[in-house]
Structures are given as C-alpha cells and as structure tokens.
Amino acid sequence: MRLMVHLEAQRDATYQTAYHHKLRGRVWRALEGSKFDSEHDNGHPLGLAFSNIFPWGKIQEGDRRSLLFASPREDLLATIARGLQRNRDFNVGEMSFEVDDLSQLTVDVGEPGTRGVIETATGVVVRLTPEHREQYGIEAEHDAPTYWRPEHTIKPFKDAIRANLQHKHDRFAHEYQDGPTDVDGELFEGYDLLKTYALPVTVTTGTTLDVVLSKWRFDYRVRNDAHRHHLNLALDAGIGGRNGLGFGFSNIVEKTKPGESELERADAFA
C-alpha cells in the first residue's frame, strides 16, 4: 500500500540532496504519541520505505511537489496520514512545504505469469556482513563498513537483499507464508545495474557515514502467489537496508499481464 503526499512549497529554496535524516525526522514527528513511537531506533525494520521529494530541482514558492510512502502495514500509513493532517507543515531542512492533499495508491506486481520491471527510485544500501565477506572472500576495509560494489560480483548482492527481505517477511507476513529464503528460485530474473555512487549520509544526529549506493532495474516474472508476495513486500518495505532513511524505494515501471504482448501493453496500434 502507498500514501501519496501532495506538497506546496512555502518559499524559494535550493533542493537539498542530503535530505534523508531531516525527512526521517518529519516522519517520526507524524508518528509522535502513536503506538509506533516505541519502535523508534529499536533496531528492527519499521516496514516503511519512501521516495525523495519529487520532481528534483530548484524550488520556487507555490511549486507543487510530491512524496510517496510505502508500507506493508496499512495502520502505519494511516497513522502517518493522520499526523500530516493534524500538522500540515512539512519542513525538510531549508525546504519548506505544506501538505496540500493525501491520496492512497495500491501497487501490485500482478498475478502469476505477469512480467515486468522494477526500478529503484532511491539508492540501494547493501552492507555486507562478516559472514558474507568470509563466504565470498571479500576483505574488510579497515574498520569501515563494507558496502557492496560491482567488483564484489552480483552473488553477494543477491544473497544480501534476499536475506534482508526474509527478515522483513518474518516481521510483517503471516507465519504460514514461506519467505524468500524458504523457496527455490531467484527473487528477480534480471539485475541491470544502472550506477553506483557514494553519498555522505547523516544516520543519527552528529554521525555521518560515507555510504555506497546502487541503482537498478530488476526484471521479474511472477512464478506463483508466494513469489508475488515477496515482490510486493520489496515494493512496500524497500530493497536492502537503511529504508528508514529513504533508501531502497522502488517502482514498477513496466508490467505485462499473462497472455498480453509487449505491443498490446504499449497500445502500439492505437
């Protein structure tokens, strides 16, 4: 499930690319006094992913911008919505907005047999654990965290995002449902790396880390209902780590239903 937040700029501003920590703070202010307050910094995924404020670019007073929240927990999104309705000021650092409207969206990869492409809208964080490093012979970089890079090959990346998604499955799915590491088959059919880049990120007040991020296009074909659940969970809870800072948010950019050709999907003969 997704929540679209429609914003109106209150004054001119430069778009801040280092928005993550400030935006997370605004989310938690919307959750103040709710049952989710106790989950702040408890070490477990909240089950929330969110986009950047879009479109990018210099902000002028009166501009319309948007922001998307996604979560497998409908009550979490409902609580955020109520918090934003109570206090419509939406300030992220020097960027000052007011919440103009809220709308609900449903995103689904489709029934079994559906093919499509999921593209990451924000960078994916994959921090390799000591077990991953040992398994794949990756040397640690002094005391700094080891983030996935292309030279590590694709296998550690696949294993890491799958294990991360399993952790989210264990927290948010029904016990009777198999998780992504409980079944055979890849999460995605294709992994097209678009770019990698480093970004200084404030993870807590006074603590900034240089994080290595990657952006992707993932090809998928829905094998069965369990696989459909796993893909939708990735869309709702985010891919990889640091989702609470807005990383790993993704969108479906192509989708072809079973029995439908690419030409039909694109209305090529219209």
UniProtKB/Swiss-Prot annotation:
This is CRISPR-associated endoribonuclease Cas6. It comes from Haloferax mediterranei (strain ATCC 33500 / DSM 1411 / JCM 8866 / NBRC 14739 / NCIMB 2177 / R-4) (Halobacterium mediterranei). The active site is at residue 41. Disruption phenotype: Does not produce mature length crRNA; precursor is non-specifically degraded. No accumulation of the CRISPR leader-repeat transcript. Allows excision of defective provirus 1 from its chromosomal locus (detected as restoration of the attachment site attA). GO terms for molecular function: endonuclease activity; RNA binding. It is an enzyme of class 3 (hydrolase). PANTHER family: CRISPR-ASSOCIATED ENDORIBONUCLEASE CAS6 1 (PTHR36984:SF1). CRISPR (clustered regularly interspaced short palindromic repeat) is an adaptive immune system that provides protection against mobile genetic elements (viruses, transposable elements and conjugative plasmids). CRISPR clusters contain sequences complementary to antecedent mobile elements and target invading nucleic acids. CRISPR clusters are transcribed and processed into CRISPR RNA (crRNA). This protein probably processes pre-crRNA into individual crRNA units, and also plays a role in generation or stability of the CRISPR leader-repeat transcript. There are 6 CRISPR RNA loci in this organism and a single cas gene locus. A CRISPR-Cas type I-B system. InterPro entries: Cas_Cas6_C, CRISPR-assoc_prot_Cas6, CRISPR-assoc_prot_Cas6_N_sf. GO terms for biological process: defense response to virus. Signal peptide: none annotated. Its EC number is 3.1.-.-. Belongs to the CRISPR-associated protein Cas6/Cse3/CasE family. The keyword NADP does not apply. It holds the Pfam family Cas_Cas6_C. Keywords: Antiviral defense, Endonuclease, Hydrolase, Nuclease, Plasmid, RNA-binding.
